[in-house]
Amino acid sequence: MCDFMDYIQLAFYDASKWNRDNSYSRLTTTANALLDFSTPERLKVNLSSLSTPHFATTYTLGTVGLIDGSISYLFTTIPLHNTPSRSSLIPLRKLVPGYRQIYPPSIPIEYPTANDHSGIPAAVRSKADNPKMKPTLLHATLHLPPPTTLTGLFICRLSSTTQLSLAVCSSRAPASKSAPQATLLTQIFHDTGKYSSEFLFSTDNALLGFKGLWNFGPDPRKPTRGDPASQRSRPLLSLLSAGGEVYYSPVSSVVGLSTGLRFATLPAATENAHSAFPYTLTLTLTPLTGSMSTTYSLLASPNLAFSSRFGFNVYSWESEMVAGCELWRRSKSKSQNIYPSAVDNLAWARLKMGVPDTAVSVNPEHELSYFHKEGHNSSHASDSVIKVRVDQSWNIRALWEGRVKELLISAGVALGPASRSTLSYASPVAPGGLSSYGWKSVGVSVLYAS
């Protein structure tokens, strides 16, 4: 489950009409959400609030083993009037990343002017709603106790196709009397719909980097030729994207290089009852280290998704195999009120196979719209989610996240073979030299937002 400030930051992207999916950094976002999720390792409490449409705060306290905390503040020039901020109203699917549906490339939408107050009473309009002010976000977090760390984030939408991001991190050792060390990361994003590019510079070893992503197919910036009706009747069914990244540090003489491909089905490909399930395939290569990784993610039903990853290194001949899944659950009362046909758990299967449903009256348009769109109703209907992943070494992580009354709970456990460094002479060792198997971590995280 992402933090409340991350949720507000995503709401800022949506309000400013910035497409965060058209980036090489998010090439494997679906597989990462299903396979690389983290579990809480201790007790953690988060108290958050969106006190005004422009200002949010978060207080965090962690315990078990050690006590620490953080204080976060966030300000945005775009009013987030339509963003649910109470923990009882926040859509759970907005907080828990899962299968991410890719949409056809489109022309970047001009960020809304601040004088667009449609539906907003004049009494709640603030002085920050200046038509000359560009969409901007300011975020600062102070981590306590020592070593004290201060992080800051500045995001500004410079134009409809360009966005600037500045991130700073400053830390100071507990007993050090010297000036705090600070690192600045500058990123410039450029998105045209057809392709996207990212330039970055970090003061840490003077690191320079570039990322790019190219979408094959028609260019959304160019007008379609021929009959517009025929163009609408033949929508894109899939999207193939290719990209890469390169890094170089003149100080440490470090070079980094990677490239990748992504093939994903689009919503138009799965609207037909006889079509396949939505899926995403990715292939990433790192030539310098000889690493190769492939992922396959499948949305088997509106509430069930699977993902797998296979990695291989041509130099060391080491391999990695990971599999995971997520299962969403919702209460029967909400299912019957919002989606009457969803009471039958096999309705979606009959719909995909084209078999008429005689037991329950199914509305195909209603079911398909729920299957593919991340609407507020489907988000509210989801009460909890279970995630499980396992690799070839039998490292298992299980995570449950859901809503309990006014609280958002995240509970997880990690199991796996213990490392030899943590084994004592009395620790049992399995035949063949295998180490013992047991608990690695258990934790609970609680979030309350008002």
From Swiss-Prot:
Its main location: mitochondrion. It is found in: Mitochondrion outer membrane. Keywords: Membrane, Mitochondrion, Mitochondrion outer membrane, Transmembrane, Transmembrane beta strand. It comes from the Eukaryota. It is a multi-pass membrane protein. One of its GO terms (cellular component) is SAM complex. GO terms for biological process: establishment of mitochondrion localization; mitochondrial genome maintenance; mitochondrial outer membrane translocase complex assembly; mitochondrion-endoplasmic reticulum membrane tethering; phospholipid transport; protein insertion into mitochondrial outer membrane. Lacks alpha-helical transmembrane segments, suggesting that it resides in the membrane via beta-sheet conformations similar to those predicted for other outer membrane proteins and porin. Component of the ERMES/MDM complex, which serves as a molecular tether to connect the endoplasmic reticulum and mitochondria. Components of this complex are involved in the control of mitochondrial shape and protein biogenesis and may function in phospholipid exchange. MDM10 is involved in the late assembly steps of the general translocase of the mitochondrial outer membrane (TOM complex). Functions in the TOM40-specific route of the assembly of outer membrane beta-barrel proteins, including the association of TOM40 with the receptor TOM22 and small TOM proteins. Belongs to the MDM10 family. Component of the ER-mitochondria encounter structure (ERMES) or MDM complex, composed of MMM1, MDM10, MDM12 and MDM34. Associates with the mitochondrial outer membrane sorting assembly machinery SAM(core) complex. This is Mitochondrial distribution and morphology protein 10.
